[in-house]
Amino acid sequence: MDGDELTEQETALYDRQIRVWGAGAQRRLSKSHVLVSGIKGTVAEFCKNIVLAGVGSVTLLDDRLVTTEVFNANFLILPDENAYVGKTVAEICCDSLKDFNPMVHVSIEKGDLSTLGVDFFEKFDVVVIGYSSRATKKAVNEKCRNLAKDVAFYTVDCRGSCGEIFVDLQNYKYTKKKLDETVECELTFPSFEEAVSVPWKPMPRRTAKLYFAMRVIELFEETEGRKPGECSLSDLPRVLKLKKELCEGNSVSENHIPDILLERLVSNNTEFPPACAIIGGILGQEVIKVISGKGEPLKNFFYFDAEDGKGVIEDLSHKL
């Protein structure tokens, strides 16, 4: 991601943030290429943040047609029906993001994310997936891992006032300050498939309840053939039945996953804007950190619940 020096125009535009993270980090940002799929409220916040930060390019992939329901959860889509009739979410968001920072190349890609070949992902440094099934997350993550270069992979899922971020940086090297020294560090990340298949019983008792709840909801949607977020309160009895089966299969108490938490996740499919802003901000910060190579990255799950206002990082792998 290193390249030529910043132009005079870039230096002037990004002057304030260059003072924070340095010209080298800004140069790496300006040469980076980010793919974003599934643009709902949280992902829209993320896109705004990285475009304002000055990444080189953002490619948007979301072929859903814009509807009233869609624009209610996405501030990049203005509530003007005449402006979005017949247009996709990616097309409308692309136009809005260009206005935020004309120096960032924002484009769209059409197609089904799950059917794109491995070579498609080679042109990107970062891949961010929102609003996707468990199977799609696994498949795209595996394709990114099969590339000759390391591609930073993220998933984000916000349901009501709760959210989850997953991170896979494969083998990642970075620097951090330790007293007066700059220390080189390295982290090894598990894949999405590895991270969501960790046995529950050996996990620390303090592990975020949202981790387990998200696994139940994802599996329910997959087995029922639902799209992400296509749950309602009427599904709760079957969701609770699946929870019971998963807890028994993992030899843990059903108290691992409070019923009230699952009820919140299935009954509120509209993203809570303040939660979107916080989770999208954290995700943007992490991507900027990884592109710049400065600072310790999040490993490998982040959870936020607006009900208690707490953010929790969980490092989960088979090496527990």
Curated annotation (Swiss-Prot):
Keywords, alphabetical: Acetylation, Ligase, Nucleus, Ubl conjugation pathway
Gene Ontology molecular functions: SUMO activating enzyme activity
Pfam families according to UniProt: ThiF
PTM sites of type N-acetylmethionine: M1
Domain of life: Eukaryota
Predominant cellular place of this UniProt entry's protein: nucleus
GO BP, one annotated term: protein sumoylation
Pathway: Protein modification; protein sumoylation
CC annotations in GO: nucleus
Subcellular location: Nucleus
Subunit architecture: Heterodimer of SAE1A or SAE1B and SAE2. The complex binds SUMO proteins via SAE2.
Family recorded in the similarity comment: Belongs to the ubiquitin-activating E1 family.
Stated role: The dimeric enzyme acts as an E1 ligase for SUMO1 and SUMO2. It mediates ATP-dependent activation of SUMO proteins and formation of a thioester with a conserved cysteine residue on SAE2. Functionally redundant with its paralog SAE1A.
Name the record gives this protein: SUMO-activating enzyme subunit 1B-1
Native species: Arabidopsis thaliana
